[in-house]
């Protein structure tokens, strides 16, 4: 049985750990509130730009733009959103496991058939160690990234599609459902074959021509899809870390309760032993 000193040291150490995890839980909760607001605030912009693009695509005939047209797929691009820091439960492992399985099944790890653009240090390190074909990366993004932070990468990804580096582009990230639930999600970014909507669209008059507007608007729309996924993923990251730290704090408190019970029992046994020895010694003197 552990000594009273050992048990007390474990209690002290566990209490310190619980204080750290509780603080991290509170920090993540604060970051989550802002990340949720950022993600929600971006939705109206994304919906409006999609509405305009859909209006052009549905109302105009004969428009030919490479970002709207599917072509034979010889190579596929993947954008993978992960985090720079861990301690977030299954946030990173879930999306990385999904992407790894998809690439093995679709491409048999043939680097001539796929390319990966990865966001986040943990995702980059994981994929590099396992020999995946990474062609671009971004690390060190803030907890609340601006559009400027991601615009260059999104522009490069779209330019590579236009240049034929790959024939389709998917994005993988954790979609924020609630504070306790996040889902690994796959969205097709390019080509924009599904941009048209069944919903009634507003009639617009375009000046200059629809083709000229699409040259500017389609890249912006594709970039907004990437940025929207990043904001969604950031909310999921903070939620996952908050949940993980709450679980760690709860587990620490259970350990403290168990250790305290063991400490009290050991102390009681020690006191009983001392009393027994005193009584035994007194009896021997009689």
Swiss-Prot record:
The keyword Cell division does not apply. It is a peripheral membrane protein. It comes from the Bacteria. The keyword Transmembrane does not apply. InterPro entries: ATP_synth_F1_ATPase_gsu (IPR035968), ATP_synth_F1_gsu (IPR000131), ATP_synth_F1_gsu_CS (IPR023632). Produces ATP from ADP in the presence of a proton gradient across the membrane. The gamma chain is believed to be important in regulating ATPase activity and the flow of protons through the CF(0) complex. F-type ATPases have 2 components, CF(1) - the catalytic core - and CF(0) - the membrane proton channel. CF(1) has five subunits: alpha(3), beta(3), gamma(1), delta(1), epsilon(1). CF(0) has three main subunits: a, b and c. One of its GO terms (molecular function) is proton-transporting ATP synthase activity, rotational mechanism. Belongs to the ATPase gamma chain family. This is ATP synthase gamma chain. Gene3D superfamilies: 3.40.1380.10, ATP synthase, gamma subunit, helix hairpin domain. GO terms for biological process: proton motive force-driven plasma membrane ATP synthesis. It comes from Bacillus cereus (strain G9842). The gene is atpG. It is found in: Cell membrane. Keywords: ATP synthesis, Cell membrane, CF(1), Hydrogen ion transport, Ion transport, Membrane, Transport. One of its GO terms (cellular component) is plasma membrane.
């Amino acid at each position: 049985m552990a000594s009273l000193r050992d048990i007390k040291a474990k209690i002290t150490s566990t209490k310190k750990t619980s204080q750290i995890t509780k603080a991290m839980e509170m920090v993540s909760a604060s970051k989550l509130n802002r990340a949720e607001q950022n993600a929600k605030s971006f939705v109206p912009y994304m919906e409006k730009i999609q509405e305009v693009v859909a209006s052009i695509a549905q109302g105009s005939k004969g428009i030919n733009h490479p970002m709207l047209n599917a072509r034979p797929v010889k190579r596929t691009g993947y954008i993978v959103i992960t985090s720079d820091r861990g301690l977030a439960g299954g946030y990173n492992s879930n999306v990385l496991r999904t992407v790894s399985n998809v690439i093995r099944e679709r491409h048999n790890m043939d680097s001539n058939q796929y390319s990966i653009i990865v966001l986040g240090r943990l995702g980059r390190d994981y994929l590099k160690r396992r020999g995946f074909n990474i062609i671009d990366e971004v690390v060190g993004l803030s907890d609340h990234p601006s559009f400027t932070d991601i615009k260059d990468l999104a522009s490069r990804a779209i330019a590579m599609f236009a240049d034929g580096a790959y024939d389709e582009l998917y994005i993988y990230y954790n979609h924020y459902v609630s504070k306790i639930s996040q889902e690994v999600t796959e969205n097709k970014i390019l080509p924009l074959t599904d941009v048209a909507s069944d919903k009634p669209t507003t009639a617009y008059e375009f000046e200059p021509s629809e083709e000229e507007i699409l040259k500017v608007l389609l890249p912006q729309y594709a970039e907004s899809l990437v940025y929207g996924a990043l904001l969604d993923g950031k909310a999921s990251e903070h939620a996952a870390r908050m949940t993980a730290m709450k679980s760690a704090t709860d587990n620490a408190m259970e350990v403290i309760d168990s250790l305290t019970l063991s400490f009290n029992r050991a102390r009681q046994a020690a006191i009983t032993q001392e009393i027994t020895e005193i009584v035994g010694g007194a009896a021997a003197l009689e």
